Amino acid sequence: ILFRSSGIPTPPGVTLRRGDAVPESIGFPCVVKPCSGGSSVGTSIVTEPEKLPGALEEAFSCDEAVLVEKYIRARELTVGVMDGRAMAVIEIIPKTGFYDYKNKYQAGFTEEICPAPISAEDTVRVQHLAERVYEALHLDAYGRVDFLMDKADGELYCLEANTLPGMTPTSLIPQMAAAEGMDYGELC
């Protein structure tokens, strides 16, 4: 709601609590995920109506509110923002499936390309949106914003903002900093 009211595009979707009906307008495939938490725990891509109850139950086991969104066939991009300025953009490419917990934390399961192989114009669009998210959330030091870029039309959709992203030497923000010539010691 905050992103939409700030003019930041998000995938079409609805927030549900237990017992709420899923509007038919969502259709399939769709993405079901807890409203809070992280690392894609409790997140499912649902391709058939009969799999929806199980996906909802899994998401509700993580949170009392669940988001059901239209599935968008897209490239996944992420960008850090430090002190209000967007950093290099990374494209995230899981070897299989989507960027779930396993693909995030098991070595070799995901390719992270920095800088992302997108046009200069698209880079600026993603960075500008990330800065707007940073401002809308009134973030202070740093954060990271995840986006989808629709493969059909290039539209950008904000998935989420991470207000305390990982800062290990192999985390995404340090990779962005390295692409800009900043070493890990300077960053931290």
Regions found by a protein language model. Give the residues of each.
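Active-site nucleotide/adenylate-binding loops and adjacent lid/helix of ATP-dependent enzymes
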Residues: I1-R75
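ATP-dependent carboxylate activation and anion-phosphoryl transfer catalytic cores
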Residues: G7, S119-C188
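Short beta-strand-to-turn element immediately C-terminal to the catalytic PLP-Schiff-base lysine
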Residues: L16, T43-E48, V81-D83, D150, ...
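A short, glycine/Asx- and small/polar-enriched loop/turn
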Residues: E24-G27, D83-G84, K151-L156
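Short small-residue beta-strand/loop micro-motif enriched in glycine and branched aliphatics
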Residues: S40, E111-I113, T168-I173
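Phosphate-binding site of ATP-dependent enzymes
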Residues: T47-H128, L156-Y157
